[in-house]
């Protein structure tokens, strides 16, 4: 299993104060020196709430690890990434809403302009992945447009797992639609969400599409996904950075790697 470390929220801390620390490159090399991280993931958002264009340039110039850049189909961002001298290892196209706290679901593959953006990256020799819900239509769209990777949105699975097996429902930011559900109902929905991820991962495998996954994964809910044999990569960020605040980044990375690289 490949471990993609998302370092967006290290930069979030920097941007809160508009200062120079924490240093994104220091985080990069801490990750590299653990010898457990396979790639670095960053999300270049339209609103630039964390990662900035300059961060992209600096990372691509010196990173010893592959860089996966998440982004929308925004024309300005597409032009910027296509113009880069140092190319990312892949671009993962994600849905984006300026009012969202975090990505809320998978990409709508009928989105106007999506096909043109995929072609633009392919023409520059940049591999494309699509951040999608685990659905057949998304896989067929990827296959039709020569997209060799998808990343399944695991938010539904993760939220259900957290509601059932952690104290998430008692926290200040509990998800209202899950808070009042009984354990039996949560368990059934969680089982179905996992089965859907497993079924669609198998479907993708037989279609020749590499399957990655991410969103909302943490030290508790990630273990079940290791039972999906066709899953090749997990991208995890917020939970690792959250733990790093308390125990340090190196230890937080190693603890996650111990779970997913067994």
Swiss-Prot record:
Gene3D superfamilies linked to this entry: Aldolase class I (3.20.20.70)
Protein task: Catalyzes the complicated ring closure reaction between the two acyclic compounds 1-deoxy-D-xylulose-5-phosphate (DXP) and 3-amino-2-oxopropyl phosphate (1-amino-acetone-3-phosphate or AAP) to form pyridoxine 5'-phosphate (PNP) and inorganic phosphate.
Organism: Helicobacter pylori (strain J99 / ATCC 700824)
One Pfam family recorded for the sequence: PdxJ
Residues carrying the site annotation Transition state stabilizer: 151
Reaction(s) the record says it catalyses: 3-amino-2-oxopropyl phosphate + 1-deoxy-D-xylulose 5-phosphate = pyridoxine 5'-phosphate + phosphate + 2 H2O + H(+)
Keyword Chloroplast attributed: no
Binding-site list for 3-amino-2-oxopropyl phosphate: 6, 17, 216, 237-238
One GO cellular component, as annotated: cytosol
Recorded family membership: Belongs to the PNP synthase family.
Protein name: Pyridoxine 5'-phosphate synthase
Binding site for 1-deoxy-D-xylulose 5-phosphate: 8-9, 45, 50, 102
BP GO terms, sorted: pyridoxine biosynthetic process
Catalytic-site annotation from UniProt: 43, 70, 215
Complex formation: Homooctamer; tetramer of dimers.
Domain of life: Bacteria
Gene assigned in the entry: pdxJ
NCBIfam families, A to Z: pdxJ, PRK05265.1-3, PRK05265.1-5
Keyword Acyltransferase: no
Known EC number: 2.6.99.2
GO MF annotation: an example: pyridoxine 5'-phosphate synthase activity
């Amino acid at each position: 299993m490949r471990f993609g470390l998302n370092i967006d929220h290290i930069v979030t801390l920097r941007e809160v104060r508009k200062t120079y620390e924490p240093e994104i490159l220091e985080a990069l090399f801490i990750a590299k020196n653990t010898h457990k991280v396979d790639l670095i993931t960053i999300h270049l958002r339209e609103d630039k709430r964390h990662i900035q264009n300059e961060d992209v340039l600096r990372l691509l110039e010196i990173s010893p690890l592959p860089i996966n850049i998440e982004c929308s189909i925004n024309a300005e961002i597409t032009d910027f990434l296509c113009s880069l001298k140092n190319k990312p290892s892949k671009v993962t196209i994600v849905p984006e809403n300026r009012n969202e706290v975090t990505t809320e679901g998978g990409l709508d593959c009928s989105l106007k302009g999506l096909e043109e953006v995929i072609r633009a990256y392919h023409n520059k020799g940049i591999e494309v992945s699509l951040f999608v819900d685990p659905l057949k239509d998304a896989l067929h769209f990827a296959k039709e447009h020569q997209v060799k990777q998808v990343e399944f949105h695991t938010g539904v699975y993760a939220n259900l797992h957290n509601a059932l097996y952690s104290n998430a429902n008692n926290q200040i930011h509990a998800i209202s639609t899950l808070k009042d559900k009984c354990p039996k109902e949560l368990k059934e929905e969680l089982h179905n969400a996992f089965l859907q991820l497993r079924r669609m991962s198998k479907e993708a495998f037989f279609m020749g599409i590499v399957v990655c996954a991410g969103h909302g994964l943490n030290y508790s809910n990630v273990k079940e996904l290791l039972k999906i044999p066709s899953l090749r990569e997990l991208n995890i960020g917020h939970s690792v950075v959250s733990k790093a605040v308390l125990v340090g980044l190196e230890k937080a990375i190693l603890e996650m790697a111990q779970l997913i690289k067994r």
